């Protein structure tokens, strides 16, 4: 670690910031009045040879209280689970399911009133192929493994999952000539399967309304779509069916660490005494790691907005596609001047598993970990940019939009590991995009480490299959009629837009997750 070089780079941005080696990490301290400069300092501190960037620069005048449940009781006081999982997003629920394979008492706590209330419900549901990643990244390892797991996982959990593919479309002749062999070489090096070149005529066969400028593109057959929140809920329900426990409205506000172990976790529902802790806390994962004395990273929230179009516009995309970013955006498609734009795959136009067209997302570095606000400026910029990929896009097609915050680290990689300074914590942190893809594979590694460290035995009665009522609107009339004959409440439609029946709502309320 060349600390002098890092100090020069950081102080060029902000001379008042202190740079030091803190337990093998690059630690930044001080106070600035501009969030963009804080972000830039963190990026400048990234280097090989350090465990990570611990960016403790304060934003002058800014303080954010985490959203906490109002509930306070002693329901969990004195409990001694073998494993405590902090966070009920897709990673936490996938970990709970994997650990329910073992003869262990597993407890998951989530501060919201349901699972999948953070980034796990505020994303597009893409199962990514991994072509945008780099050799040596944890992201690449877990995305490749997780992508391959989804076919069987969806079958076991009764999830809708389609490999509708992704396309990366070229708008210029030079891209169409130069990029394909390089793209194919990268796919081979990374181990991404199902990548091939498609010409202009094949693009027209794949997409009913392709952009007129399309010269050719790269087709990635392994990409797919799921419902991210339905996947999270199914993972959680299956974990509960196999013996795991879930406590919602439960907020972790401190830990006691003795020697090199967490011995007590303080919550609004009492003190818990676990043998092991798994940190799956999303945008708060660095806060949890800090409580446990194991922090080597910093989460800098990266906000993104997605737009949902009316289902009648399904002809806009039958797969997921975007304009190649190698050629610069035309002036008319460039976003209006705004705050620092963060690292992003660039967004695109895609068909969701529920049949709507989704457009976006964008990316902005923000200080707030739970900033879910939307703005007309962001909506306008997304439409302006993505009209290049799909010229038929129109603001009048929008039915709603939403924002979420990604749990990005300055290294732009996951932090999936055993504890370094605290031996009974397991980190599953920095899980931003493509976290939905990676979650099942991350959970397998966490399970294997805990199985080894706690000397846990496998259950003989673990059931990987979760059976639930299928989405009736997706069934053929004769299949739907069979369900209605058994239970007339399946024929009583409550939501006419999405054709959701009273019976399906009751089934959801009576599912294992309460």
What are these regions (language model features)?
Residues 1-88, 92-93, 97, 127-129:
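N-terminal targeting leaders
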Residues 2-4, 22-27, 31, 36, ...:
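C-terminal catalytic lobe of FAD-dependent flavoproteins
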Residues 53, 96, 104-106, 194-195, ...:
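Hydrophobic anchor at the start of a short beta-strand
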Residues 84, 94-102, 111, 129, ...:
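Active-site substrate-recognition segment that forms the wall
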Residues 101-122:
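Glycine-rich FAD pyrophosphate-binding loop
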Residues 125-206, 346-347:
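Dinucleotide-binding Rossmann-like beta1-alpha1 core, especially the glycine-rich loop
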Residues 134, 139-144, 172-179, 218-237, ...:
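Short beta-strand to alpha-helix junction loop
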Residues 218-276, 280, 284:
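Helical element adjacent to the flavin cofactor pocket in flavoenzyme catalytic cores
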